[in-house]
């Protein structure tokens, strides 16, 4: 057996066992690596003023304030809301809602009977039990998310500290030319920077828009604005987790116009205008004006890759989706610019 074949057999065996050993941490390592790549320009800026260990720690501290603090805020506020529910008032609210729904559905006999049977099992006790189940699930999920976040932060320090060495090593190991490897890396890094900044600005815009509106109705605009901005990152439901309960609360107190305004404002101004119209425009602005990058990737493709990533990978899909898309497009462009051209030259 040739030494080369023997080496590749040993390498594949070792690679399999490495994947098996670290399979529970692969996603965390991937997220840490992507965050490091997207945030590395900040590290380069800090390196000019501090030692490597200090700048690495400061980068981790900044990301920790973005990842851990908001998560703690959500868990703390959500648990307070659930455990401070007044059962008597909540029962009255459910009874009132059932009456309103039954009264309006009486004009539609075809669905009235089915809805009535469904509402029979719809009570304050059942909803409270459901909320407690949700809170326990959220508690378990939040604990896992916090554990993953702490592990990611630990890996982030490692990646920031040895980032330059990792970069040079991978450029040398990849079976491509140095310029080809750099172009792939620059394309992925550029997309990550755009996505991270776009997501941060969108969360701030949506949170501020909701907080400024809701404060006029006597609610805590600061807390609800933060919760809405963070809830906007939740796949499928987003800010509806915040504005629907508030609209129901206003309805219960007879404030029909206020409830309708909150619903329309949240749907039309925030969900449609900010999330669906302003966000793609923001991607274009950040790409061309802030980073002044020459990336040849359509802005709408970046936008849809973020949506697809969230639907497949949850919260972290915001960066995983665009990364996969950018990497694949970079490979296609590499194939087009180098391999096809070389084949054409060989034919000539």
Swiss-Prot record:
This is Putative transport protein HP_0567. One of its GO terms (cellular component) is plasma membrane. The keyword Manganese does not apply. It is a multi-pass membrane protein. The keyword Hydrolase does not apply. The chain crosses the membrane at residues 6-26, 27-47, 56-76, 143-163, 194-214, 224-244, 266-286, 300-320. It comes from Helicobacter pylori (strain ATCC 700392 / 26695) (Campylobacter pylori). It is found in: Cell membrane. Keywords: Cell membrane, Membrane, Transmembrane, Transmembrane helix, Transport. Its main location: membrane. Signal peptide: none annotated. Belongs to the autoinducer-2 exporter (AI-2E) (TC 2.A.86) family.
């Amino acid at each position: 057996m040739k030494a080369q074949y023997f080496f590749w057999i040993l390498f594949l065996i070792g690679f399999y066992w490495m994947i098996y050993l670290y399979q529970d941490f692969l996603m965390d390592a991937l997220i840490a690596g992507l965050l490091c790549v997207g945030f590395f320009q900040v590290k380069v800026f800090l390196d000019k003023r501090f030692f490597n260990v200090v700048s690495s720690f400061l980068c981790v501290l900044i990301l920790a304030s973005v990842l851990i603090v908001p998560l703690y805020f959500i868990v703390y506020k959500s648990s307070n809301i659930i455990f401070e529910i007044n059962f008597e008032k909540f029962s009255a609210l459910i009874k009132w809602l059932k009456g309103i729904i039954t009264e309006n559905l009486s004009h539609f006999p075809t669905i009235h009977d089915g809805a009535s049977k469904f509402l029979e099992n719809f009570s304050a006790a059942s909803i409270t039990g459901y909320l407690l189940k949700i809170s326990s699930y959220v508690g378990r999920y939040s604990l896992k998310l916090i554990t993953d976040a702490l592990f990611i932060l630990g890996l982030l320090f490692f990646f920031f500290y040895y980032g330059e060495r990792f970069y040079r090593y991978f450029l040398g190991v990849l079976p491509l030319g140095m310029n080809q490897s750099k172009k792939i890396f620059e394309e992925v890094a550029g997309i990550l920077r755009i996505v991270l900044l776009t997501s941060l600005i969108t969360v701030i815009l949506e949170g501020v828009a909701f907080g400024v509106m809701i404060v006029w109705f006597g609610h805590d605009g600061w807390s609800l604005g933060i919760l809405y901005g963070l809830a906007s990152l939740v796949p499928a439901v987003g800010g509806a987790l915040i504005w629907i309960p508030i609209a129901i609360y206003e309805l219960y107190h007879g404030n029909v116009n206020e409830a309708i305004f909150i619903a329309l404002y949240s749907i039309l101004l925030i969900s449609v205008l900010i999330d669906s119209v302003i966000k793609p425009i923001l991607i274009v602005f950040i790409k061309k004006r802030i980073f002044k990058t020459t990336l040849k990737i359509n802005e709408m493709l970046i936008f849809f890759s973020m949506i697809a990533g969230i639907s497949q990978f949850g919260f972290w899909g915001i960066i995983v989706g665009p990364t996969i898309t950018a990497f694949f497009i970079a490979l296609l462009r590499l194939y087009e610019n180098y391999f096809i051209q070389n084949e054409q030259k060989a034919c000539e």
